[in-house]
């Protein structure tokens, strides 16, 4: 199993590390620590004297320093993760750092296409407490990466991921997606609760669709349990 752990080097992202280790400690695998730092700085044309070459200035001063700093922090984060793995006695897990310059969105998508990971692990907040899930990066990555993604809130304490709620709108991809969830979480033998919200409790069309989805799993072999339920709500 291969996991891409995408980080901005913030303290908030430390919550990702125990999950990455726990997913792999039984079967083994590789954790790719990924970080992309911006290699372009935009400055207003009237910010400096007209005879100053701002492109060269930022290339030789700020951007070079940014690269050095990113390399140093990546080394520290990699060593920290390796030490955590050793403490867990998980000798079957390897760590590979990937540090690149460029747009984080584009670089993560390209890395995903190249490495074909089983899972991308990300935080929901970055430096300065920015709400990552409200940004455009995550929306783009989710639509352009054909890879399962797991987002962990920064204030969430690690625990076994056993109880899973899967909200379905009866997509043709439901069976494949649920199979992937079982595969990723097989270490925990998860209990997956498949739910669909309906405004009318006696909606027969929705009931039939849920029954068909349930039938698809009757003869499947998987580690864990799966339950199906229609949930009545006035605000579906």
Labelled PLM ranges:
Residues 1-60, 162-227:
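Small/aliphatic-rich secondary-structure junction motif
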Residues 11, 61, 65, 99, ...:
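Residues at secondary-structure transition points
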Residues 26, 106-157:
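Gly/Ser-rich helix-loop-strand patches that form or flank binding pockets
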Residues 35, 99-101, 153, 196, ...:
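Residue-level recognition of beta-strand->loop/alpha-helix junctions
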Residues 41, 68, 72, 76-120, ...:
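Structural beta-alpha unit
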Residues 55-72:
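A short acidic, glycine-rich active-site loop
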Residues 89, 158-159:
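Short, flexible hinge/linker loops that cap or flank conserved catalytic cores
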């Amino acid at each position: 199993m291969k996991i891409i752990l995408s980080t901005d080097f913030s303290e908030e992202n430390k919550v990702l590390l125990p999950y990455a280790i726990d997913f792999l400690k039984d079967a083994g695998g590789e954790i790719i620590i990924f970080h992309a730092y911006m290699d372009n700085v935009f400055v207003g044309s009237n910010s400096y004297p007209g005879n100053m070459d701002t492109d060269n200035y930022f290339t030789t001063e700020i951007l070079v320093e940014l690269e050095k700093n990113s390399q140093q922090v990546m080394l520290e984060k990699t060593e920290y993760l390796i030490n955590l793995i050793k403490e867990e006695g998980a000798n079957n897990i390897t760590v590979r750092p990937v540090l690149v310059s460029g747009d984080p969105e584009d670089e993560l998508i390209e890395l995903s296409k190249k490495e074909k990971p089983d899972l991308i692990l990300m935080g929901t907040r970055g430096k300065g407490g920015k709400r990552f899930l409200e940004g455009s990066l995550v929306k783009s990555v989710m639509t352009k990466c054909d890879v399962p993604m797991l987002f962990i809130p920064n204030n969430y304490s690690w625990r076994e991921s056993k109880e899973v709620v899967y909200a379905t709108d009866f997509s043709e991809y439901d069976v494949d997606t649920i199979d992937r969830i079982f595969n990723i979480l097989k270490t925990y033998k998860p209990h997956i609760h498949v739910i669909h919200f309906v405004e009318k409790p006696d909606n027969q069309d929705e009931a039939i669709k849920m029954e068909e989805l349930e039938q698809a799993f009757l003869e499947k072999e998987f580690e864990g349990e799966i339950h199906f339920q229609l949930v009545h709500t006035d605000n579906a």
